[in-house]
Amino acid sequence: MARYRRHSRSRSRSRYRRRRRRRSRHRNRRRTYRRSRRHSRRRRGRRRGYSRRRYSRRGRRR
């Protein structure tokens, strides 16, 4: 029984770690996306087609 308990404990620990890491990553991504979107409006006037195409592709992928 001790062996099983030990295994489950380590498993849950790794799970928690992954969840925490993923959450922080997502938060950062959201922030950068908002910032880039704000600044992208100014650059859109110079390179309309290229910048727009690249941005839309990136948003869909992420």
UniProtKB/Swiss-Prot annotation:
MF terms (GO), sorted A to Z:
DNA binding
Q: What is its main location?
A: nucleus
Q: What Gene Ontology terms describe where this protein resides (cellular component)? A: nucleosome; nucleus
Question: Record's InterPro entries?
Answer: Protamine_P1
Instruction: Classify the source by domain of life.
Output: Eukaryota
Alphabetically ordered keywords of this record: Chromosome, Developmental protein, Differentiation, DNA condensation, DNA-binding, Nucleosome core, Nucleus, Spermatogenesis
Cellular localisation: Nucleus; Chromosome
Q: In which tissues is it expressed?
A: Testis.
The ranges of region (Disordered) come to: 1-62
Gene Ontology BP annotations: chromosome condensation; sperm DNA condensation
- Function as written in the Swiss-Prot or TrEMBL entry: Protamines substitute for histones in the chromatin of sperm during the haploid phase of spermatogenesis. They compact sperm DNA into a highly condensed, stable and inactive complex.
* Similarity comment: family membership: Belongs to the protamine P1 family.
Q: What is this protein called?
A: Sperm protamine P1
Q: Which organism is it from?
A: Pseudantechinus bilarni
